[in-house]
Structure formats: structure tokens, C-alpha cells
Amino acid sequence: MIKNSFISFQEKKEENRGSVEFQVLSFTNKIRRLTSHLELHRKDFLSQRGLRKILGKRQRLLAYLSKKNRVRYKELINQLNIRELKTR
């Protein structure tokens, strides 16, 4: 399915499923799936809560990656077509 294709795509680059990049990739896939679900089911508040939790987890991982390795962070942002973190 979709998850397996993304896993195989990521395994070509690196074999570590616990890496920050892989976790952000899997969270992004979950976010896209939940977003399409919520377009059909607008009043599904439990899914909205789950979406917010996943967004927060992804945001924390991206903040960690941007602090540790800015180059890998930029590559991942461009690869996944997501916006950069807001800096204060």
C-alpha cells in the first residue's frame, strides 16, 4: 500500500526506521491521510484531535532536526513539500 512504498523509498536512502527523517515522513503521511478524511467528515472531532497531536510531534521533530543538522532539515522540507518552521 502507500505506507510500504514510502518505507521502501526511505529504505533506499537509509535503513534506520527510527531516524528523525523517517519519523517525519511517516507523520507527514498520517497527516495527509487524516486531512483527506477530515475533508469528508468535518465533525469528526476525535480525528481532529489526533491530527493536532501528530502535527505537534512532527513540529517538535523538525525543530530538533533544524537545531542538529540544518542541511538535512532543508533537504527534508524540500522533499516533503512542507513549510519551514516559524522562528521566534
Curated annotation (Swiss-Prot):
Quaternary structure and partners: Part of the 30S ribosomal subunit.
UniProt keyword Plastid, yes or no: yes
Keywords: Chloroplast, Plastid, Ribonucleoprotein, Ribosomal protein
Protein species of origin: Draba nemorosa
UniProt KW Repeat keyword: no
GO biological process, one term: translation
InterPro entries: Ribosomal_uS15, Ribosomal_uS15_bac-type, uS15_NS1_RNA-bd_sf
Descriptive protein name: Small ribosomal subunit protein uS15c
Organism placement in taxonomy: Eukaryota, Viridiplantae, Streptophyta, Embryophyta, Tracheophyta
SUPFAM superfamilies found in the cross-reference section: S15/NS1 RNA-binding domain (SSF47060)
MF annotations from Gene Ontology: structural constituent of ribosome
Source superkingdom: Eukaryota
Family affiliation: Belongs to the universal ribosomal protein uS15 family.
Gene giving rise to this polypeptide: rps15
Main location: plastid
One Pfam family linked to the record: Ribosomal_S15
